């Protein structure tokens, strides 16, 4: 196969993952890493068929499964997808990545033209993914976040800055999807860091998350 030099990882989404479609046909012939978005509309058997198509030789690390359900659906859907992969030849070949952003996009209560995300919903889906993977003997190998290093951006609500709906218009700059700002991004980074450090010390994921969330709440000034 050849490389697609226009990108590093090329990915397939809900509208481009049809087994007989042009995008899948293209993806199966390139040597780039392949990302596959896995959401509520993806049936477990469809996921395995897609993996068989784009990674027939079961090359380890070639495919990253990017899960994006929304906080209200992740606990029902992610376990079934993990189990389907575990029962297939791809069990040890895929990389699992959590995208806690896209499934939690909502419209602003005060302005339906503005898309936003609740920081609490992002954290909820992220922590649910960590717990589910650990409970099933799987590993969450990555996190996909949309963020900016600009501290003043106000596109997502919540976090240590406690941004509200009224704050959104103050510095809403995105032309596409709402991003975590500098402080909100660090909130997430420190949470993940705390969990990983606790795991290295042999602390179970649930306990590690409880400790990390407690520290996070203290940083935000909550009782």
Regions found by a protein language model. Name each.
Residues 105, 109-114:
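C-terminal structural cap/anchor segments
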Residues 83, 94-95:
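A translation/RNA-centric and nucleic-acid-associated enzymatic feature enriched
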Residues 100, 138-139:
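Generic detector of intrinsically disordered, low-complexity, polar/charged segments
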Residues 95-103:
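Short acidic/histidine-rich active-site segments
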Residues 60-61, 92-94:
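Short, structured loop/turn "capping" segments at alpha-beta junctions
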Residues 76-88, 123-134:
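A short, acidic, amphipathic alpha-helical segment used as a generic capping/interface helix at domain edges
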Residues 30, 90-92, 136:
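Helix C-cap/helix->beta junction micro-motif
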Residues 1-71, 113-120, 124-128, 132, ...:
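Active-site-facing alpha/beta catalytic cores
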């Amino acid at each position: 196969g050849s490389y697609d030099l226009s990108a590093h990882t090329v990915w397939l989404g809900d509208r481009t993952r049809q087994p007989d479609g042009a995008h899948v046909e293209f993806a199966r012939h390139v040597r780039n890493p392949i990302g596959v978005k896995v959401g509520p509309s993806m049936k477990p058997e469809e996921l395995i068929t897609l993996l068989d198509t784009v990674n027939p030789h079961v090359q380890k690390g070639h495919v990253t499964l990017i899960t994006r359900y929304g906080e209200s659906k992740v606990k029902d859907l992610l376990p079934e997808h993990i189990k389907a992969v575990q029962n297939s030849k791809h069990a040890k070949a895929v990389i699992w990545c959590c995208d806690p952003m896209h499934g939690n996009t909502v419209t602003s209560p005060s302005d339906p033209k503005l898309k936003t995300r609740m920081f609490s919903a992002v954290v909820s889906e992220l922590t649910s993914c960590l717990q589910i993977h650990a409970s099933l003997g799987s590993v969450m190998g990555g996190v996909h976040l949309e963020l900016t290093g600009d501290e003043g951006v106000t596109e997502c609500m919540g976090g240590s800055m406690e941004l509200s709906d009224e704050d959104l218009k103050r510095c809403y700059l995105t032309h596409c999807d709402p991003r975590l700002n500098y402080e909100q991004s660090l909130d997430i980074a420190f949470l993940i860091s705390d969990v990983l450090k606790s795991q290295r010390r042999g602390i179970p994921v649930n306990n590690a998350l409880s400790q990390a969330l407690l520290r996070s709440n203290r940083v935000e000034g909550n009782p």
